């Protein structure tokens, strides 16, 4: 979503600047500097591009009522990517709060790969009033051209997942096409495929790598190079799945199983942004089971079938976070807040008994933590109004809120000498960093690096001639 927000901002600013409109467009995410976030609350832009998590945090400030009082509309791009999960739950609750602050606010959702449009209409509608949501269907473009890449011997290996057998053929495709976007399912595989391609890059073609653990500067540099048409190939993860529009891409390669027809269509859609010409994609299975998955996905795309997760009741852990965010913004009456959140499809099912359980959990931390004062987050006064137990609870909430599970990460920085860290390259997980010692080498951010020192949650490195390891990362299980 960060890459999508940055790309939409760039695409909006170009016509705004050309026309000379006095319109400010800004992003707000984990990449946004604290000083800009603070300024946005006192001098908000005309258009704010953000994520569900950042919006929820923004609503936790007391000035959020004044900030959003004049909100005209909220546009949810690529709604299929998160509406059915916990990020969708968080956004659904934020929508109910925004609707309470700005009742005339209009809701708009966009997607090119919906399997169940009626379900999304109901999710978007306040109080489930589906008739208030108009479904607008765009013109269908040329059907995608999807093929499965096979070894020269026409036998896919029995085992393995990296598809290293295909590296010479991948490089040949890169040479034949103007710009190639290569998708992998993990950050480890993105670095691994990049290193293997670089080893056979006899023409020294400009090839980049992009994933969520790289530093903001590294990601923006690669995104800018792609937007300017300076790269011949880019190896990426789901960090570039959503709606990033680079017109020069004429081929998409999917390494490994595509994990569904909708996901595959989303990635194919990054190529050839013209309705009258098909997007081209090659699926590269790592083993024979992935070949079967790739075949099924190709047949589904050819037949115009979509898949995706079904809507389910909203998570109570997300609801507890929302209650805490509301308490940070202002004291609340439990009956009024319950009526507000029931306006969303995700939480229309919450009855009084469930609501009291959630409030009790936020109040005490639950039966396992109620003996500890720091988990007593909210209290109810004599008039039945809930408020923060202490002002410090607001800062604790904003520091720890979110529904994306993260592992402990260490910064990777170029050593500036004398034990000082210089430019940041990104982050690796603590468990990987714990396996490193000074002198060890590993591949990261498209470079071979040697460990100089580990200190203060940082891995100080310098350039190396060879690498032996690639960082691996924990994450959500693939479908």
PLM region spans:
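Conserved nucleotide-binding/hydrolysis modules and their immediate coupling elements
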Residues: 370-479
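Helicase motor core with emphasis on the C-terminal RecA-like subdomain
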Residues: 1-329, 334-383
């Amino acid at each position: 979503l960060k890459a999508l927000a940055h790309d939409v901002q760039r695409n909006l600013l170009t016509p705004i600047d050309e026309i000379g409109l006095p319109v400010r467009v800004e992003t707000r995410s984990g990449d946004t500097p604290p000083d800009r976030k603070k300024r946005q609350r006192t001098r908000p832009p005309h258009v704010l591009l953000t994520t569900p998590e950042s919006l929820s945090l923004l609503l936790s400030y007391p000035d959020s009522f004044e900030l959003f009082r004049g909100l005209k509309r909220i546009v949810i791009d690529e709604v299929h990517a998160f509406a059915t999960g916990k990020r969708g739950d968080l956004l659904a609750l934020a929508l109910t709060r925004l609707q309470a602050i700005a009742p005339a606010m209009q809701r708009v959702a966009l997607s090119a790969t919906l399997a169940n449009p009626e379900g999304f209409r109901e999710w978007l509608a306040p109080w489930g009033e589906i008739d208030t949501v108009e479904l607008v269907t765009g013109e269908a473009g040329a059907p995608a051209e999807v093929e499965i890449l096979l070894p020269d011997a026409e036998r896919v290996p029995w085992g393995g997942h990296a598809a290293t057998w295909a590296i010479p053929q991948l490089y040949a495709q890169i040479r034949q096409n103007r710009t190639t976007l290569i998708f992998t399912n993990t950050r480890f595989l993105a670095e691994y495929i990049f290193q293997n391609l670089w080893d056979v890059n006899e023409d020294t073609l400009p090839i980049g790598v992009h994933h969520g653990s790289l530093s903001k500067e590294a990601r923006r540099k690669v995104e800018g190079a792609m937007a300017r048409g300076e790269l011949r190939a880019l190896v990426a993860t789901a960090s570039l799945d959503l709606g990033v529009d680079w017109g020069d891409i004429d081929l998409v390669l999917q390494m490994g199983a595509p994990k569904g027809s909708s996901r595959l269509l989303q990635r194919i859609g990054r190529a050839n942004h013209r309705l009258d010409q098909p997007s081209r994609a090659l699926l590269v299975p790592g083993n024979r089971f992935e070949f079967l998955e790739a075949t099924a996905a190709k047949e589904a795309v050819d037949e115009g079938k979509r898949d995706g997760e079904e809507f389910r009741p909203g998570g109570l852990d997300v609801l507890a976070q929302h209650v805490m965010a509301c308490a940070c913004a202002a004291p609340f009456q439990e009956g009024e807040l319950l009526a507000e959140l029931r306006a969303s499809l995700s939480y229309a099912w919450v009855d009084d008994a469930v609501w009291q359980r959630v409030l009790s959990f936020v109040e005490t931390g639950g039966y396992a933590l109620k003996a500890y004062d720091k988990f007593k987050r909210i209290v109810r006064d004599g008039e039945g109004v809930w408020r923060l137990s202490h002002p410090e609870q607001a800062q604790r909430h904003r520091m720890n809120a979110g529904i994306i599970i993260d592992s402990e990460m260490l910064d990777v920085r170029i050593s500036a000498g004398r034990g000082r860290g210089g430019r940041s390259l990104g982050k690796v997980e603590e468990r990987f960093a714990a396996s490193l010692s000074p002198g060890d080498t590993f591949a990261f951010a498209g470079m071979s690096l040697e460990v100089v020192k580990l200190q203060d949650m940082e891995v100080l490195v310098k350039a190396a001639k060879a690498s032996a390891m690639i960082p691996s990362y924990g994450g959500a299980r693939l479908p």
